[in-house]
Amino acid sequence: MKHIRNFSIIAHIDHGKSTLSDRLIQECGGLSDREMAAQVLDSMDIERERGITIKAQSVTLDYKALDGETYQLNFIDTPGHVDFSYEVSRSLAACEGALLVVDAGQGVEAQTLANCYTALEMDMDVVPVLNKIDLPQADPERVADEIEDIVGIEAADAVRCSAKTGIGIKDVLEVIVAQIPPPEGDTEGPLQALIIDSWFDSYLGVVSLVRIKNGILKKGDKFKVMSTGQTYNADRVGIFTPKQTDTAELKTGEVGFVIAGIKEIHGAPVGDTLTHAKHGAEKPLGGFKKVKPQVYAGVFPISTDDYESFRDALNKLSLNDASLFFEPETSSALGFGFRIGFLGLLHMEIIQERLEREYNLDLITTAPTVVYEIVKTSGDTIYVDNPSDLPAINNIAEMREPIVETNILVPKDYLGNVITLCVEKRGVQKNMVYHGNQVAITYELPMAEVVMDFFDRLKSTSRGYASLEYNFVRFEPADMVRLDILINGDRVDALAMIIHKGLIRTKGLALVNKMKELIPRQMFDIAVQAAVGSQIIARSSIKAMRKDVTAKCYGGDVSRKKKLLNKQKEGKKRMKSVGNVEVPQEAFLAVLKLND
């Protein structure tokens, strides 16, 4: 046991976590040079293309240290994006220490802080590593001071390395052995294993990544999942060296996988505890908290025949992604689909992309909404995540919107722009601290404003230097109303949105004009209106296409032309009473892109 080290790598986006893990694997001979691909652990196509890590992955390596001993290193590569912070907390629950990787050119960013605090809250040892020292703009001294100043951990003698060129990788490994404590646990005691992650393999069933806290799990053991009480046989156990390698047993302190031929998707929920079926542990391990979705959107398959396969795809995905929440929903405009809860807009994009790629579905998404707390006049409190579930205006006593506390780190040159943005988004400033060249500002902002496009706007006003992390604090009373779009007097439920009272004129007008561009002209006039309750606040008409019926008249009396024009008018009127308007797919997406 004293030769095992479990650690994860935490860092901000693009500070080089995945490249560093590649180097560690190479240094310890986990893969031959031929098998090395850049970003070995980013196994999904989307991860490679966007250059971000989404899923945590684990690897077991053997390292012969300078003291002559061989150590088993289990490390977990974690995502750095704010939407995936629950992945990070999950990986940390399985470790004793973390490497905090900081780009020696960029310095500390908000996400570095957020993940680092998560680690410190769990009483873990955080070891700073300065990466990218080969860059001309690298300034390790300044960054070391920044780490001590902003994060508050010793960094004067932090290891300096360059994952790209391989300088200092040996030192990183030595620091891991020296500074990260070995796991504690009772080998003789009853088995307790924490499920860090699970995914569905169409041949093997559910594959679970586990960290053994106490006891030993042998191949062929009967074990039970503590939350469901189901028992299974461990058909195969083993480790990833990144390749899947079978072993005879997993001992206390080790991280590895278990395959038990579990076929139902929720057989081994993430964060659960495994123990032996006979003489098992009494109580489960305290893992990590379940995350609540922050943003909801309706997602519908473009062809209704895909509904069943869409449901299967969601089931399989939710096994791998503990934070996904979904329930069936119907819409008069879009048919059958699901209301899905996401952690943020990036998460929503990724899930939609994974569904479209991995399961070949064509999907359409409605505008994302956050959860509102509503006090009805009858005194009941309800939570609404869908604009069409909103009670009538006269039944609402008070509407409360979720407020998040946002911590933003920004270089002081861009401070003005960022403050202007926060004010425009109805933010309230709580705190501002200068750290050298960086400024840390804390704002309370409505979550609805943050999830829509705040992240992109923040990046563009600060030329990409600002970084943010946010967490929910409370519900606060607000003047929110539902904006409906009516087409020829009929409400289109998929276009409704909940917005602040001060924005209804501008938003309503923008939306109506956008619809006017996107809905194709018909043979009759179409009225597009934006309404709040029964009050119409904006309108525009899409003019009818008409045939020139008087073209064949040559000379003759004017009453002849009038007759033809009146006949055409009658026809249009009749057509309007029976015609219905097809709203194209782009129109639904326009709601998302209103601010462009």
Swiss-Prot record:
PROSITE patterns, A to Z: G_TR_1, G_TR_2
tr-type G domain ranges (all copies): 2-184
Family, similarity comment: Belongs to the TRAFAC class translation factor GTPase superfamily. Classic translation factor GTPase family. LepA subfamily.
GO CC annotations, alphabetized: plasma membrane
Keywords tagged on the record: Cell inner membrane, Cell membrane, GTP-binding, Hydrolase, Membrane, Nucleotide-binding, Protein biosynthesis
Protein name: Elongation factor 4
Keyword Membrane attached: yes
A Pfam family matched in the record: GTP_EFTU
UniProt cross-references to HAMAP family, sorted A to Z: LepA
Annotated function: Required for accurate and efficient protein synthesis under certain stress conditions. May act as a fidelity factor of the translation reaction, by catalyzing a one-codon backward translocation of tRNAs on improperly translocated ribosomes. Back-translocation proceeds from a post-translocation (POST) complex to a pre-translocation (PRE) complex, thus giving elongation factor G a second chance to translocate the tRNAs correctly. Binds to ribosomes in a GTP-dependent manner.
Molecular functions per Gene Ontology: GTP binding; GTPase activity; guanosine tetraphosphate binding; ribosome binding; translation elongation factor activity
Sequence positions that bind GTP: 14-19, 131-134
GO biological process, one term: positive regulation of translation
Superkingdom: Bacteria
Record membrane topology: Peripheral membrane protein
Compartment annotation: Cell inner membrane
Catalytic reaction equation(s): GTP + H2O = GDP + phosphate + H(+)
Enzyme nomenclature, EC number: 3.6.5.n1
Alphabetical list of InterPro entries matching this protein: EF-4, EFG_III/V, EFG_V-like, EFTu-like_2, G_TR_CS, LepA_C_sf, LepA_CTD, LepA_IV
Top-level class of the enzyme under EC nomenclature: hydrolase
